[in-house]
């Protein structure tokens, strides 16, 4: 017995998204019978090959079967108006995962390019200023996090000669994740900007950003902002563990 990832998928949501794209399924109107059958074929194939399927895939299989069963239950017209679509939560998670995946691919491409060299003048973000009201209890989306990342990167560039080749760095996402985790051991939350001295290479800022993005996706951290375009706070998430 040995354990592998199902066809190199990063978890059950990744597998489901692959099936949706492969069979051109409308993500907002998923045919649960067809999708469940395709998903179960993957899991069954792994069992037939005596591969130890990770428990998260089996949990998702149970969830798919439950959703499929609910959709098969007879309902009155009144119940149909009141009851939520049992697919709603799954669709929301798939869309969120799809967005994270797209952003991560873009940022990984940026990092690969910067690992070779990078030359850029500071970017003016004053056009992003606004006087609109802002709810401090609102959970921010990826746009605000990217704006905060851009602010850090610009400050780093201000401390870097305008035309300089930045040599390849060895700072990894694992190291960045370890730094964030260590900071969370000491504090329940901390300011995103406090991770930086603004003298480190731009690649290190990008790597920290990718690490926080992955930790947010995994529920290890939450990201909050008290005022629009203000500092970003990194907070312990529901899946955070001191270890």
Swiss-Prot record:
Major location category of this protein: cytoplasm
Keyword Cell cycle listed: yes
CC terms in the record's Gene Ontology section: cytoplasm
GO BP term, pick one: DNA replication
Role noted for this protein: Participates in chromosomal partition during cell division. May act via the formation of a condensin-like complex containing Smc and ScpB that pull DNA away from mid-cell into both cell halves.
Subunit structure and binding partners: Component of a cohesin-like complex composed of ScpA, ScpB and the Smc homodimer, in which ScpA and ScpB bind to the head domain of Smc. The presence of the three proteins is required for the association of the complex with DNA.
Protein's recorded name: Segregation and condensation protein A
Organism: Staphylococcus epidermidis (strain ATCC 35984 / DSM 28319 / BCRC 17069 / CCUG 31568 / BM 3577 / RP62A)
Encoding gene (name): scpA
